[in-house]
Amino acid sequence: MSSSQSPSTPSASLVDSSDSKHPDDLPQIYKRRSVWTSSEDAVSSSNSPEQTTPFTVREDTNADIARELDLPDDPEPHLVRRSSAPMVDEAGTSNWQDASEPLMPTVKIEDFLYFGPNETEDILRLNEQKAFEKAEKKKRKKKKKAVMPNPPGSSMCTEQSLSDLKARFGLGAVTLRVPSPEERADSPPAGFYTLYEGFFYGCLLWLPIPRLVLEYVTSYQIALSQITMRSLRHLLGILIRSYESETEITLAHLRNFLEIRRVPKSEVDRYYISPAKGKKIIDGFPSKDEPYTDHFFFVAIEDAIHEDLLGTVLTRWGILERTLKFLEPIPDDFLSAFHALSARKCDWLKHFSRERVECALRLLHGVSCPTSSESSDHRTQFFVDMQSTKLTLREVYAKKKEDKERRLAEERRLVNTGLISPRADPEATQDGNVIPDATAPQTAPEASRDGVNPYTAGPVDAAPAEAQGAEPSAAAPEAVLALPAIDKAAGKRIRVDDVSSKKKKKKKKASGSEVEKILPIFEDRTASANLLGGCVGPLLPPPDTLLESRKYAETASHFLRAVASMNRMVHSYDSAMRSNMEVAGKLAEAESRIQAIEREKNEALSEAAAAKLEKEEVERTAHVNKENAIKMAEQNLKANSEIVRLKRMLSEARGLRDSEVARAVQTTRREVSETFIAKMKNAEHKVSLLDEVNDRFMYLSQARANAQLIEALEGGGVLESEKEQVDEWLKDFADAEVNLNRFMSELKDDLKAPAPEPAPLSPGGHRSVESLADEAGITDQAGSLLPAKDNRPSEDLD
């Protein structure tokens, strides 16, 4: 045994895997839990006890682990399994060197590999670290600097971009022009129309621009280049859905389906279109569109717009003209059209593509949609041709008729060349004289012995050559032919779906005489010879007595076969002519009905046009009347407000006049009262001085009385008599002082004038509350503290 295979070899031990070059990344081998199974050669391995039993880890497993841990793809060395752990003193020499190996079967590892918890955490940590590094690299990438047009407002389109646009969308015959740096999108040159590259790449627009789209934007007096990409997606999506569902929509439908508004915070007159409330048809638009306004170009107006719209479509930008919503006409089929358009999925990002647009336009113009195997690189070159005219019902049927005739002619050519077998006519199949019965071979065995197959018949044209080329409708039956009877009856019976036909067939087969009656005469050569021999009278002896009776019978049979072929040809021609006459009669009847329907349609259209004109006239009259009523109401409102204002002004003038009169009277009264009060105060002052004067006068009177008393006493008067006289006077004038004081007080009271009390005037000078509120800036006086209307003072004119 070699040292490499010895169980004591350290490099081959179970614990040596920890000595790998990547001790941190590669887990130890005992942590790998594997499923081990015995191999088929376990018996052979048991016969060699001296051989070790290696356990080899599969290279694909090692490669998977190395790939996850970013290790080299070198496989691990072979591992040798031991029956027990090594001894402690194994570092020197092995104690198992001379020991015999146990009998262990060779096993192999399965494809199931399990990782320990630490190994799984390491793998997750490494994956997270790699993802983090990738994210950091993306963040470190510099953002592309936005390229702006120079000068601002000019176009960034180039000849190369327009050439790519032409090549991608099949606009080879359309005249496209790159704007100059001085030209702007809102004012294209004469004879040109402004469009954006984003309208084609992001909105799937085609040329010429759909008529209904132009009518919609023109009805608001704006240009197509003034609406956003999402707005155009709404319009084109509704048109495509109408083509697919065969729903006819008009401008009135679009104006009721959609609403248009000005883009907020926009420096130019740009507008966006959104669905009306509860009328969403197209959904799933991109959350944000790429900048498209800088990539505008000019297209020749005759290539972009239909001829009948050249004088009405606006090329320069305009301002939105909005009408009242309740004045918009609502079509009769508005709800049904909405349900038909919204019946199918209408997610723009998921369900709309250039292929769907092409298929919808093909359906519109009666062209079959291409299969999925056809290349989608053949773009919309046919749009220009198909947009010009739409096939009428007669043209569609005529086209179908031409296709059928071409197909029948091709089939006849293949039949004549022998590439295909002709088809049997149903009428010829039902005729017993054309196709022999299956029992015919049993009735004429001698013909078969002669080497002539009597059941073979070639194809017979349904009509002469001149009849076939005369009219396509007359050549509807392709070929009336007699199939070989042996082909029909060999090895199978004829299947008939009709039960009555089966019963008749059985009855015919029941009796041999009836079978012989339905056979053609040329199948019986004796009968054919007798028939032709009797045509010339008694000059010809009986055919059976002729020397060449057999050849004569054969010739007569062939002759009658030719006559039968001629009869079949005449019969088929006659039946074809009869069917053609019936078809012609039905066609004439259909033509008459179509003409009647056309007349009714024209009458209905004329009535509808008259009704429409009448409706428009009524609407115009109603609109005018409504405008007049509105104007009259506004004038009445203005007149009423003017009357109220004049009444208020008159009331204010009255109040001002009354206040001025009251103020003048008050001023006069104040002046008079002031003068009177001054005089009264002067009189009062003098009256106050009257007391002093009165006292002095009393003193003077007393002095005079004393003087008179002294003089009387000196003159010889008696004191007692004088005293009595004085007492009598005191009694007579006892109330004189009281009366004097009362008189003086009454006089003072009468002379005292009250202070003037001026009547307070309003701060506004008798002005109305409404005028004061108007001056204060109050526009709405509802809910104010005004008195009730019934309690307000009357402001009627005198």
Curated annotation (Swiss-Prot):
Compositionally biased region (Low complexity): 1-13, 462-473
Location within or outside the cell: Plastid, Chloroplast
Basic and acidic residues compositional bias, start-end: 57-79, 789-798
Phosphoserine modification, residue list: S762
Designated name of the protein: Uncharacterized protein At3g60930, chloroplastic
UniProt source species: Arabidopsis thaliana
Example of a GO cellular component annotation carried by this entry: chloroplast
Keywords annotated in UniProt: Chloroplast, Coiled coil, Phosphoprotein, Plastid, Transit peptide
Secretion signal, residue range per the UniProt entry: none
